[in-house]
UniProtKB/Swiss-Prot annotation:
This is Outer capsid protein VP5. Keywords: Capsid protein, Outer capsid protein, Viral penetration into host cytoplasm, Viral penetration via permeabilization of host membrane, Virion, Virus entry into host cell. One of its GO terms (molecular function) is structural molecule activity. It comes from the Viruses. It comes from Broadhaven virus (BRD). One of its GO terms (cellular component) is viral outer capsid. It holds the Pfam family Orbi_VP5.
């Protein structure tokens, strides 16, 4: 019964579907769909993109026919390039002029595009370089201001800093000297430790000096011999205190170059300031170690510290003189030079300072040091020393030795007046000097007493202690 009902209903269902499809196919909507699609295809074909696509199909087919390539690949490439707007028209293969012309046009077009891209790149680079150049100029301006500020601070405080360093060391040595003068029971624990360490260090130094004494003397004698030979054969004769001697050996030959110890302070004034050095081992210490029977006793150590304190006081006075006299002269000189300098150099403090340093330069023969000379004859026996004192002392003298004739000559130097205030090397108002050859015996007595020489003249060239002895015990001035 059930199967009969299904068999009766199924044909009816199919009839209903068939009638629906018939109505849909005959409806106006179905008729309008093909016409709309046709119109869309027509509009696409009439559009620019459609025209390019159609032209691409035609050009692809033509290219495939001419070149033998795959039709599908040629058509696809031509359609894509045409739609993208980068496809070139295929030249006539039978017209070589057209082919060459199109190739030249393509080359010119590519070259033009590269040039335009390069111009755009150059413009951007020029803008960046202009920006960087502006930043560099700004930094240079800032650097000039910083340098000027540094120079002003340095010129104003460097000498004060040097004075403070020297004063601090002198005060420490004063405390050490006072501790050495006291009895051992009166010293503090720190003072005892300090003196024990000082005694230990100088004991080791004294042993080294004793062990190497013979080698030092031999080296000094060899240096003197070589210096005399060089002076005799290689130097020119110039007038000097009424005699013809060799040109100056600016730094002392012989043992002075061996015992020159220490470091040079920073030259801020353009002047020669090597004499302001604080030596690591003072000449008084070397003198005491060589002459004292007990170089590590309290008395010897006190003598070492007191001699160093005197040297530090002299350096302190010299730095105070440079700060009070030379620094204002340097500043005034810088101002005068800046007024005359070109506009592009007025703000460059380094150039102005360099010119001022040259203006205030002290000649070599007037610099504070021991200038050693030797004669072109008998250089083994004749030695001339020009001792120029510090700037603040304004003193200098000439000391001549003739070991062959057993005589020496001492004379004040009054003719040197370098352009550094105040004028230096001037004698007292009532001073009048004349050549006064004196026997060498008093000199030998002084040097022997100071421990500077011994049998056979082995230590004559330890000249710094000798000169200090002569300066303190020089012969009386003779009046004309």
């Amino acid at each position: 019964m059930t199967s009969k009902r299904l068999g009766a209903r199924f044909p009816g269902f199919l009839n209903r579907i068939g009638s629906g499809i018939t109505r849909a196919a005959r409806s106006d909507t179905t008729k309008r769909i093909p016409s709309a699609a046709g119109r869309a295809v027509e509009r696409v074909a009439a559009s620019e993109i459609g025209q390019r696509a159609i032209a691409g199909v035609v050009e692809g087919a033509a290219t495939a026919a001419l070149t033998g390539e795959s039709v599908g690949e040629s058509v696809k490439r031509a359609v894509i390039l045409n739609v993208a707007g980068v496809h070139q028209t295929v030249p006539d293969p039978l017209n070589p002029v057209e082919i060459e012309t199109q190739a030249k046009l393509r080359e010119l077009d590519l070259a033009n595009k590269r040039e335009e891209a390069q111009i755009r790149h150059n413009k951007s680079m020029l803008q960046k370089e202009a920006q960087i150049l502006g930043e560099v100029q700004h930094l240079m301006t800032v650097q000039e201001h910083v340098d000027q500020a540094k120079y002003e601070v340095r010129s104003g405080r460097a000498l004060q800093a040097a004075q403070a360093i020297v004063k601090g060391e002198r005060q420490q040595l004063d405390r050490v000297t006072k501790a050495l003068i006291r009895e051992n029971e009166m010293r503090t624990t720190d003072e005892r430790k300090l003196i024990e360490g000082m005694r230990h260090n100088y004991s080791a130094l004294a042993k080294s000096v004793d062990a190497d004494s013979a080698l030092i003397e031999e080296a000094v004698e060899q240096t003197v011999d070589i210096g005399g030979e060089i002076a005799e054969h290689a130097t020119a004769s110039i007038p000097f205190v009424g005699e013809a001697v060799s040109a100056g050996m600016a730094t002392a030959r012989g043992a002075m170059q061996i015992y020159r110890l220490g470091k040079t302070i920073h030259a801020i004034t353009g002047l020669h300031t090597n004499h302001c050095e604080i030596p690591a081992i003072h000449q008084g210490a070397i003198e005491t170690l060589l002459t004292s029977d007990s170089p590590t006793s309290d008395a010897s150590l006190a003598q070492i510290t007191s001699s160093r304190v005197r040297h530090l006081r002299e350096i302190e006075s010299e730095l105070a003189h440079l700060d009070a006299e030379v620094k204002p002269a340097m500043q005034q000189m810088c101002q005068d030079i800046a007024k005359l300098a070109p506009d592009h150099l007025k703000k460059r403090r380094g150039v102005i300072h360099m010119n001022a340093a040259h203006e205030l330069r002290v000649p070599l023969k007037q610099r504070p040091m021991i200038h050693s000379y030797t004669s072109p004859w008998d250089s083994d026996y004749v030695l001339i020393l020009h001792v120029v004192g510090p700037y603040h002392s304004g003193q200098a003298f000439v000391f001549c030795l003739d070991l062959a004739l057993d005589q020496f000559h001492f004379e004040e130097d009054t003719g040197s007046k370098p352009p550094v205030p105040p004028p230096r090397h001037r004698a007292p108002a009532d001073f009048s000097a004349r050549p006064a050859p004196i026997s060498l015996s008093p000199l030998l007595a002084i040097l022997t007493q100071r421990g500077c020489i011994g049998p056979g003249w082995p230590r004559v060239l330890m000249i710094r202690p000798c000169i200090s002895a002569l300066y303190r015990t020089r012969p009386p001035t003779r009046r004309c």
